[in-house]
Amino acid sequence: TLGGNYVKRDGILKGEMISFAGLCKMACCNLAESFENSASVTVGYSDAISGARQIKMLGLAGTYTQILDENRPIMRGLSAPYGLSYTPGMWLNSIQVSKGISSVTAGHEAITGQINLEHRKPTDDERLFINFYLDDELRPELNLSTALPVTKDKKLSTILLLHGSLDTHLLGDMDDNGDGFMDLPKTRLGAVANRWLYTADNG
């Protein structure tokens, strides 16, 4: 859809879908920033020193929300508050959000809901995708993905995902309230992922 966010009603569970069009509206987004236009999920800072973010669903903290990577549980325990910032939004095809207690097929941690991430696939038709962002604080961010068939029959394909971002306060330390402490931490982030897919003759 043009809006990027819509409610799925064709499955067993009703849930919100954040499509790639919705993710493109937030060019600087990591996973934590991907929910800015979502009415189902609230994101805030849980630690101002490290910049860790925490999600809230149905008024409860993110520890009660199960986060899935293509229906596989991820971000358990201590990785939950920091993993949101380490997943670039431009690596995702879509995000599915379902509120309330759901199926235990993918795990039992979902009390307030589930968030499922669908990444870009090696079989994507878009062979090259480049995204560059620069905000008013001179924070740059670069995302690149390239999906290629390795063999002529396309049985073997791969995708390379690259991400880099800098938040070094080039215009000076951010201290809008004048308390002597930076409002945001300085960060440098680089991430690389390489996925392969082999399709056998028998499927």
Predicted regions and their residues:
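Short strand-turn segments of transmembrane beta-barrel domains in outer membranes
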Residues: S94-V104, Q114, E118-P149, M182-P185
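Short acidic/polar hinge/loop motifs at secondary-structure boundaries
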Residues: Q54-K56, R72-K99
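Transmembrane beta-barrel architecture of outer-membrane proteins
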Residues: M26, N30, A52, Y82, ...
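Short, acidic, small-residue-rich periplasmic hinge/interaction motif at the N-terminus
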Residues: T1-C24, A32, G62
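Transmembrane beta-barrel domains of outer membrane proteins
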Residues: S34, L58, S98, E118, ...
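Periplasmic-side early beta-strands and strand-to-turn transitions of outer-membrane beta-barrels
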Residues: D124-D125, A147-G203
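Extracytoplasmic beta-strand/coil segments of soluble accessory domains associated
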Residues: A32-P73, N93
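Outer-membrane beta-barrel proteins
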Residues: L78, R139-E141, D167-D173
